[in-house]
């Protein structure tokens, strides 16, 4: 085997890690596990209880997924403040709760010394040309993408997680240096 081929194979091994993609929330989190660039699990989990209990359950579930699927890298969605409910503070309350969930996931990645990427929603949605179409339409288009691409009919949360993971894989592939 030539040195160039050995180098390419080593780079490919780095490219196709076991990836966990999350569309996290305080109650239902969609997730997708990718191995060798393909989704092998597309699912979600739901937690209940007060916010503190839910945060602990989310943390433990993510730890379980990382161990079960031998995850090398995690990608999760950044949060954004949205103008909701005619300008009332519903958006702010939701944002604060999502910030706590985000903080738990972010801290966990640091604690576990995991490779991770945080993707703003507008960035991964732009990859699929669904950004700026309104929440309802974006969710439906993400589901349609997953069905058309992977043949899997899934929930909105599962579709978003799958698209987030696919975005990272496409981005890694476009940045791969074949020389």
Regions found by a protein language model. Name each.
Residues 2-179:
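Phosphate- and other anionic-substrate recognition elements at nucleic-acid/protein interfaces
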């Amino acid at each position: 085997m030539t040195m160039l081929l050995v180098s390419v194979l080593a780079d490919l091994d780095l490219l196709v890690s076991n990836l966990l993609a999350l569309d996290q929330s305080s109650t239902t989190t969609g997730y997708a596990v990718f191995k060798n660039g393909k989704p092998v699990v597309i699912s979600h989990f739901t937690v209940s209880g007060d916010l503190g209990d839910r945060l602990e359950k989310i943390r433990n579930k993510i730890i379980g997924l990382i161990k079960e699927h031998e995850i090398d890298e995690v990608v999760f969605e950044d949060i954004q403040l949205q103008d909701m409910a005619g300008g009332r503070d519903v958006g702010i309350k939701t944002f604060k709760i999502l910030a706590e969930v985000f903080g738990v996931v972010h801290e966990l990645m640091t604690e576990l010394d995991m490779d991770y990427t945080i993707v703003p929603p507008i960035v991964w949605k732009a990859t699929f040309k669904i950004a700026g179409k309104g929440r309802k339409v974006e969710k439906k288009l993400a589901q349609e993408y997953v069905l058309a691409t992977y043949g899997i009919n899934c929930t909105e949360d599962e579709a978003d997680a799958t698209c987030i993971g696919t975005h990272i894989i496409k981005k890694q592939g476009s940045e791969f240096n074949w020389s």
